[in-house]
């Protein structure tokens, strides 16, 4: 009788992999910031299923998650019980530079850009520099890949990444070095689009060295950049007159002195000149501001409100949206040493301001200010960088008082058995953060030096007196093409 030797090792079983869409397929609008672009890009390129119902995950061996924002940490907590034994969960995305929130449930967490490495993850590679294993506390260097001109979607491509401006609160300059996609690739992408809208993604369109040429191509082809954002000082007559959709402006600080202290030095005179330019053309504008910035007082808002009332009287057409975002000290930026605070008094004043704009379209410029994020929801985002967001923690967060200051909410969590680290409210140069094992550099690695510089500004006579930031104006005038007011 003939006998056969059985193989010592059988063929490796193919692992079934999928993406899980935490938003249940609800966010799919073109050009929306909430559309899960990474899920769409990777699932289509590598033929991966996208699952929208957690009960359907049992059929898969590897589940990929794209965590877009801090709210996604809570979404994971609510569906974590669907993870079956032996199943691997792997998270990546913008929120994962602070992995503590999901390290309790994820087997691996990707830190940084993943275009080049994603096929390796699908193939089963797990010993990769950007892959954080919560069971191993080794240092992980944020993966900052070279910009890739391959379109993200059929109508969107990344034109630049990083930011040369280095605002102290913003994640972009501190995680990525500044890069631009090849101009010829961008122009070819625009010309190839069948529709009228294209998404040319960047932190600020004005920083792109060849954007004037791109604007001419858009005009010649009858197309519009649907995702444009402008630096206030970069607005010119040409840009404003050519813009068919809303002009998006990140002003950030309510007053000149606040903008100066966070390294976004837009003088009030320049700011008003640019708003004047936009409204004289009857354009739609959206100016984004932060509140709860270091050193902020009520008279900072007085300055902003005076500017709004001035233009309210001056113009009879156009629209102006004025959203306010509570500052959240972000990890891996100079602001990581800023102790978080939420001024309930300021939020109440913003609400009164919002109400005062109702019906403005009946007499002139249509002003609109959406309701700002309240203290409890803001606090939920802030603490998610610091502690594991388990179902128990998520339940406690839902029971937080709605209109209280930070200390009161910290105490409320403590009473529910959820303790925050002491460093949450007490930070210095030697603080070890939950994310200290993640190394980011961008174009400037010395974040503490930048924070210390801000502290000096806050203590300066200029900041205390609110004196104009005179020495910054010449540079701003150059950036604006010589149109800034002296």
What annotation goes with each model-predicted range?
Residues 1-17, 27, 31, 125-159, ...:
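N-terminal [4Fe-4S]-dependent radical SAM core
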Residues 26, 99-102, 165, 260-262, ...:
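Flexible glycine/acidic-rich beta-alpha junction loops that bind and position SAM and/or redox cofactors
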Residues 18-49, 73-79:
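Short, charged N-terminal beta->alpha structural module
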Residues 52-138, 334-381, 396-401, 447:
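Glycine-rich beta-alpha loop elements in corrinoid/cobalamin-binding modules
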Residues 43-59, 187:
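A short, well-structured beta->alpha microelement
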Residues 1-22, 44-50, 359-486:
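Radical SAM enzyme core and accessory elements
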Residues 19, 26, 62, 190-303, ...:
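Conserved SAM/AdoMet-binding glycine-rich loop
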Residues 25-33, 148-184:
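Canonical Radical SAM [4Fe-4S] cluster-binding loop centered on the CxxxCxxC motif
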